[in-house]
Amino acid sequence: MNIWMTVLVLVVKAVVLALCVTLAVAVFLLFMRKFLAYFAYRVGPVKVGPWGVLQPIADVIKMLFKEDIMPEQADPLIYRLAPVIAFFCALGVWVVIPWAPRGSWWSSMADPNAGVLVILAIAAMGVYGTALGGWASQNKYGLLGSMRATAQMISYELAMAMSLLGVILMTGSVSMYDIVDAQRNMINLFPQFLGFLVFYIASLAEAGWTPFDLPESETELVAGYHTDYGGMRFGLFFLTELTHAVNSAVLSTTFFLGGYNPWFGLTMIPGFVWFLLKVILMVFVLYWIKCTFPRFRYDRLMVFGWKVLLPVAALNLVGTAIYVALWA
């Protein structure tokens, strides 16, 4: 009976998690449109529902009823699987995110001892959805876009992983809960500020967020690796990109802003609420970046990843190792 109850709880958590993430991404998209419109002196979505709040639902309905056209030269199986692989890899990161302290109903779905490694592994697997999507469509623009996305993800993932090594050294653990609990007195943003900058920039590049949205550069590649995708399959790729952007805010909150730990001694506010407030703060930073920075040139993007970000991450790791060895 206990085994079946455990399985039932996990299934319920998985369904609730998927619904919550999808809802969060829809809200993220709505506010992004409003924010971008405000910066461009426009009004944004206003037609669907009061103040345009139902616009994401209208977008989903529109994509669901669009005709699903597959190119004749495409590989049918891989063409259909690629967006699903990409989306579930983006969604899988949330399985080990500690939303609240251990024992809470809304705590993480899984609590592996090597949670950081699980996140890096799932993030690395997301490359397959992008690469296969561009290759399966047998379109030159899609193939070039997928090659760009794959090279970009692999390049910046090294810097992202190395920036987390400093956090792991200071915490002495690769468990997500241990990393969050170690920030009760002081968040990692201050001792690991260099690591935070590297991680945040690399996570934006992983997500293909501005100014790193080179894989779908409209002036060069039409729409990149999802040029030949339409309907809900295009919607899944679009949802994947937005989920990656939200993942960037969530992981930055967990690793560097203390996760569910309260700030300023305000312990009367639940940890789950603190977590959401910090994520919202990082999300608005994402909006601000998207409104402010132009797109990089592709060669400068790669040079920045290998010759700037990776050495800075290595320098941060060496400095952290010396500090831990001498004073910690």
UniProtKB/Swiss-Prot annotation:
Q: Does the keyword NAD apply?
A: yes
Biological processes per GO annotation: aerobic respiration
Which organism is this protein's natural source? Symbiobacterium thermophilum (strain DSM 24528 / JCM 14929 / IAM 14863 / T)
Q: Which NCBIfam families match?
A: PRK06076.1-2
PROSITE patterns (UniProt xref):
COMPLEX1_ND1_2
> Keywords in UniProt for this one?
Cell membrane, Membrane, NAD, Quinone, Translocase, Transmembrane, Transmembrane helix, Ubiquinone
**GO molecular function annotations of the record:** NADH dehydrogenase activity; oxidoreductase activity, acting on NAD(P)H, quinone or similar compound as acceptor; quinone binding
Gene name linked to the record: nuoH1
Any coiled-coil regions, as ranges: none
Q: Could you tell me the membrane topology recorded for this protein? A: Multi-pass membrane protein
Q: How does it assemble?
A: NDH-1 is composed of 14 different subunits. Subunits NuoA, H, J, K, L, M, N constitute the membrane sector of the complex.
Which InterPro entries does this chain map to? Answer: NADH_UbQ_OxRdtase_su1/FPO, NADH_UbQ_OxRdtase_su1_CS
Which cysteines share a disulfide bond? none
Highest taxon in the source lineage: Bacteria
Cell location = Cell membrane
This protein is called NADH-quinone oxidoreductase subunit H 1
